[in-house]
Regions:
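Conserved aromatic beta-strand anchor motif in extracellular beta-sandwich/beta-rich domains
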Residues: 67-69
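Acidic, Ser/Thr
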Residues: 53-57
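Extracellular/periplasmic metallocenter environments
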Residues: 2-18, 76-120
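Conserved "cap/hinge" positions at secondary-structure junctions
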Residues: 50-52, 86
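Beta-strand acidic-aromatic groove motif in beta-rich domains, primarily in extracellular
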Residues: 59-65
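N-terminal edge beta-strand
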Residues: 13-47
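Residues that flank catalytic or metal-binding motifs in active/ligand-binding sites
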Residues: 46, 61, 109
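Beta-strand-rich interaction surfaces with strong enrichment in secreted/lumenal proteins
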Residues: 37-40, 71-76, 84-85
Length: 120
């Protein structure tokens, strides 16, 4: 049977950023050839959770989610949702990009994670 988005409690069709103290939850959609946001800004030391939902309906169209500076890399299949939590301990601009060839414009599927240094 084909997975349905409602089968995952964190599945989303809307993009959002929620902050609760130093915990940041990013709900992010992926639909070829773009992520649902261009950038996310957090503070150094924040605990960041990305919840990524692939909204594509094509059975073999997975999307990668890679933040190489944080050693994060996984693939989210169609109508699947996966998440990752990490501490934003490296100030600077970190590229998030799709590592699974998904579309003719695959190389455009990227966004920025901006980690603001403490005291700046």
């Amino acid at each position: 049977h084909r997975p349905r988005m409602e089968e995952h409690p964190d599945a989303t069709t809307k993009n959002s950023i929620e902050r609760n103290g130093n915990k940041v939850t990013v709900r992010l959609t992926a639909s070829a050839p773009v992520y649902g946001m261009q950038e996310v800004a957090v503070n150094e030391g924040d605990e960041v959770t990305f919840i990524v939902t692939n909204n594509d309906e094509i059975p073999d169209l997975g999307h990668g989610f890679c933040v190489s500076n944080y050693n994060i890399n996984f693939v989210v299949g169609p109508f699947q949702t996966k998440s990752v939590t990490f501490t934003a301990g490296k100030p600077g601009v970190h590229w998030i990009y799709c590592t699974n060839f998904c579309h003719a414009l695959h190389l455009e599927m990227r966004m920025r994670l901006i980690v603001k240094a403490r005291g700046v």
